């Protein structure tokens, strides 16, 4: 689990240290910087996977990633405290070519296993210095193996593309089934594997989909006989034998199927990060999604960004982090029940009403 994250000079985030819990729901209106916080984990993953150069260029160059550009910021700094045992730190600087390079990466090891946040007293090891890409992923030292396990433990999921060209709707390779991909492109293959290896989870996913789409009877997943090694999201409708596939689902339903598959699998990812999962979901589906999130948070750490009033109402104040923009910077404030008691108890406001009335920030 991530204990805390320290970010400096990344997009709209000037300098923030944010402790995290098993469940973290970021709420805020458009433009405050929720997605920038989520994007930080994509940057971190790109460093680990030796894709920093590609990542910076895909996002318009390093100036687009630096807080107010290189005229104001000359580096991006990140530090992640994993489970109070390991810390990973990096510093990225700009090159004249417009990409970023790694000034250094290092890790800290809490060898005494004490609840000690004086990281300078932890054992420190330098991994990279003044390189274009990190070498950590190919390092076989015992200490690197622990760090790689942590850095490989999270994925940012975006199930936004539900268009007719969405990879969730069409064919995918049946062998692409080890884990659900971040855009759901192997949804059919992953579900098929669950149906063969984890029937209990597969049945639960079907039942959950049925609860928000009563016309849905069950999935009818099988390898295509004409397209060798391919599979698509075929399913059966109640009271009909008409052929249905992924193109027959509404945008909200296919997004919900991907979310249910992610959250109801038995072998959950250690850290699950989801950007705006509420898009296109009916209020009843949002409530179901929240229930799945709470269930998953008993076994995994979840970080979710949203601007849905219905979704935030499903959680306790301590689960919610209000994201706001002040003096040109993104700031974060975790709620607590005691400070909100006058609004929640005395005035009988819901959590979303407190937010919508701008009593806790997060509204521009």
Model-flagged regions — what are they?
Residues 1, 290-364:
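C-terminal lobe/lid and adjacent interdomain/linker elements of RecA-like ASCE P-loop ATPase modules
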Residues 1-14:
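N-terminal pre-Walker A segment at the start of P-loop NTPase domains
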Residues 21-59, 183, 256-257, 305-308:
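Phosphate-binding glycine-rich loops of NTP-binding sites
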Residues 28-31, 276-281, 311:
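ABC ATPase nucleotide-binding domain "signature" loop
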Residues 39-100:
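Conserved P-loop NTP-binding catalytic core
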Residues 86-220:
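Electropositive, glycine-dotted interaction segments
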Residues 203-264, 271, 277-284:
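Conserved ABC ATPase signature
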Residues 282-287, 317:
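Short alpha-helix of the ABC ATPase nucleotide-binding domain corresponding to the H-loop/switch region
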């Amino acid at each position: 689990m991530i204990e805390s994250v320290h970010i400096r000079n990344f997009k709209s985030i000037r300098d923030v240290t944010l402790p995290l819990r098993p469940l973290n729901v970021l709420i805020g209106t458009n433009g405050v910087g929720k997605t920038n916080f989520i994007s930080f984990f994509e940057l971190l993953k790109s460093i680990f996977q030796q894709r920093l150069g590609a990542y910076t260029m895909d996002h318009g160059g390093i100036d687009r990633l630096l807080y107010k550009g290189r005229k104001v910021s000359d580096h991006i700094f990140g530090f992640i405290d994993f489970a109070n045992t390991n810390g990973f730190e990096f510093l990225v600087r700009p090159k004249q070519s417009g990409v970023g390079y790694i000034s250094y990466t290092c890790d800290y090891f809490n060898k005494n296993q004490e609840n000690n946040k004086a990281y300078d007293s932890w054992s420190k090891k330098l991994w990279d210095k003044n390189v274009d890409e990190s070498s950590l992923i190919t390092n076989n030292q015992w200490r690197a193996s622990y760090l790689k396990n942590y850095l490989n433990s999270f994925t940012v999921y975006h199930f936004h593309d539900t268009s007719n060209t969405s990879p969730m709707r069409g064919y995918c390779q049946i062998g692409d089934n080890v884990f659900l991909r971040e855009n759901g492109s192997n949804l059919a293959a992953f579900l098929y594997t669950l149906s063969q290896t984890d029937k209990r989870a597969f049945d639960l996913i079907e039942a959950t989909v049925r609860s928000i789409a009563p016309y849905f009877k069950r999935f009818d997943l099988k390898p295509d006989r004409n397209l060798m090694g391919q599979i698509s999201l075929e399913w059966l409708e109640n009271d009909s034998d008409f052929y249905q596939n992924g193109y027959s689902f509404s945008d909200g339903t296919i997004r919900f199927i991907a979310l249910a598959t992610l959250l109801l699998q038995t072998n959950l990812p250690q850290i699950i990060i989801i950007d705006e999962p509420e898009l296109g979901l009916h209020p009843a589906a949002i409530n179901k999604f929240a229930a799945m999130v709470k269930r998953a948070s008993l076994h995994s750490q979840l970080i979710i960004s949203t601007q849905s009033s219905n979704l935030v109402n499903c959680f306790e104040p301590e689960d919610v982090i209000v994201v706001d923009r002040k003096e040109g910077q993104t700031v974060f404030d975790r709620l607590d029940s005691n400070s909100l008691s006058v609004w929640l108890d005395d005035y009988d406001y819901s959590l979303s009403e407190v937010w919508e009335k701008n009593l806790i920030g997060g509204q521009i």
